């Protein structure tokens, strides 16, 4: 899967996404394909962090619902990302209920060896959370922390939008994301001042929407 965008990068496409969604609602199939290409990488990363290897199947189910209900959507590009994330989350939770399993951590020893080293910057350490092995580590977090990190870092939602997806207050989502990132920093082997640096960057990155 490679790297998926950080929130700042994802949001750069919100204008194009909003325009594509509007055209798609008027029946433009090419515009729907553009919206899919913009949203799918982050959505798939979000689902990988919840259901692991079944993410592709769950994403397919989610996109069927998205296409079916597209005419009901009202909002801009950022709103569309939040709306699609809500649908994908519902499908993921349905999938987990059918499996009756709890997501498990799946990182390997080699994965840990390849994580950010002590000489990496705090920003690089945060960036590393978007790689596929990191999504496996995120799956091992408590559910509230995992979903908060995934929605903020992988999908690129702001605080209020992530809170709407989860049905929680923005402050609660921000706290869960901060705690999740701090726990991941420990798993990455980043301790002491470096760990605090990562979580400080996380606080700025994952703070309330500007």
Each model region followed by its residue ranges:
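Structural recognition of an alpha-helix C-terminal capping motif at a helix-to-coil junction
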Residues: 57-64, 78-90, 175
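A short, charge-rich alpha-helical start-of-domain segment used by transcription regulators
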Residues: 21-45, 134, 146
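Arg/Lys-rich amphipathic alpha helix in sigma70-family domain 2
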Residues: 49, 71-75, 85-107, 127
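Amphipathic alpha-helical segment used for protein-protein interaction
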Residues: 26, 116-151, 155-165, 207-209
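Sigma70-family region 2
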Residues: 25-26, 49-50, 61-80, 98-100
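DNA-recognition helix of helix-turn-helix
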Residues: 89, 93, 145, 154, ...
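Short, basic/polar amphipathic helix motif occurring as a linker/hinge flanking DNA-binding modules
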Residues: 95-118, 125, 193-198
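Short, charged helix-capping/linker segments at alpha-helix termini
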Residues: 4-7, 25-33, 44-61
């Amino acid at each position: 899967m490679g790297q998926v965008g950080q929130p700042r990068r994802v949001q750069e496409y919100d204008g194009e996404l909003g325009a594509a969604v509007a055209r798609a609602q008027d029946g433009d199939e090419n515009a729907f394909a553009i919206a899919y290409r913009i949203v799918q990488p982050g959505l798939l990363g979000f689902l990988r962090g919840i259901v692991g290897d079944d993410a592709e199947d769950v994403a397919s189910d989610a996109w069927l619902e998205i296409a079916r209900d597209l005419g009901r959507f009202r909002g801009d590009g950022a709103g569309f990302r939040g709306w699609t994330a809500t649908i994908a989350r519902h499908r993921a939770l349905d999938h987990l209920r059918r499996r009756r399993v709890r997501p498990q951590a799946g990182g390997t020893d080699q994965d840990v060896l390849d994580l950010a080293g002590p000489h990496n910057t705090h920003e690089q350490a945060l960036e590393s959370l978007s790689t596929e092995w990191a999504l496996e580590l995120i799956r091992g977090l408590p559910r509230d922390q995992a979903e908060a990190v995934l929605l903020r870092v992988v999908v690129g939602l702001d605080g209020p939008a992530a809170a709407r997806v989860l049905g929680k207050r923005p402050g609660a989502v921000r706290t869960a994301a901060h705690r999740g990132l701090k726990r991941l920093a420990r798993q990455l082997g980043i301790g002491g001042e470096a760990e605090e640096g990562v979580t400080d960057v996380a606080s700025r990155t994952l703070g309330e929407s500007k």
